[in-house]
Amino acid sequence: MRESVHRRTRLCAVMSLAVVSSSFFALPATAGAEPVSTAAAADTPVYAIESAKASRTLLLDVAHAGARLVVVGDHGHILLSDDQGKTWSQARVPTRQLLTAVFFVDEQHGWAVGHDAQVLASSDGGKSWNKQFEDLKREAPLLDVWFKDLDNGLAIGAYGLLLSTADGGQHWEDVSDRLDNEDQYHLNGIAQVKDAGLFIVGEAGSMFRSRDEGQTWEKIDGPYQGSLFGVIGTAQPSTLLAYGLRGNLFRSSDFGDSWQPIELKGARGPLEFGLASATLLADGSLVLVGNGGSVMRSTDDGETFAVFNRSDRISLAGVTGNPQGNLILVGQGGVRLTSPTGADTTQQ
């Protein structure tokens, strides 16, 4: 039986902070049958509480809005940094729900998604946000979001939820029936793969790919039956990584036709922590993060990884880099600016 999605607000004490696996849900099977409801413009918003400690609370994702960094997390917190992660300020946000993912298509326009199937949008680099969409009856969170341009985007979430917009989020359409997902497996991650298309991964090893920017989807047989928490395209055409429970990591160089398991081995042996998030850095290297303070870097397009475990063993949910080569990590205990390996300066 799937446990309540609301337990995801305590993910710092359990599995992955970045995504929701099959063990985090136990809602009625009819939840996905509720009609889509766009947030009413007349609704009086409840804004996130401003707090000096917001940067130390549970944070789940990080993105670049041009030179600015934007992070999202619990209680509707959205934080901004204009000095590459040294200091943070809090944005004004019309929700107190947990926000799970954020995506910017350029330095001004971005979207954040979260619980209550909420979609928030910003047109000023994350300084202010408006609520574009929510569905209170669905009782399922959105877990990832992707935009092709200012108009066309997709959001994915629990119970196989797939939303599409063609007008920058002014209207969202439930297009879950585009997926061959009869069991309504939770969809955890979506990514664009260079010169190939879009790829979605989720619960029970589910995988879907699209060669036409999300208009149609093909279900494919993957290499793993456990939950996959995310997917990322590499710098090479048709090449991607899918990652999930217990350190399971797989690489494909043909857009999912075939897969190779990638071993992650640290000083104490094979890594068995859940993998939560990944990023492609400007130099083409890949960085993965997960539970147990795990930070992994690849400089050969994901064929091998060097594994580093932070001494604090915190659960990490998101990662990106800055122009100086340092990493910005988010997760348990907030946001951290670290060395290129993921270590704090005192650990180097």
Each language-model region and where it sits:
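Bacterial N-terminal signal peptides that target proteins for export
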Residues: 3-16
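Bacterial N-terminal signal peptides
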Residues: 13-26
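Residue-level hotspots at or immediately adjacent to binding/recognition sites across diverse folds
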Residues: 31-348
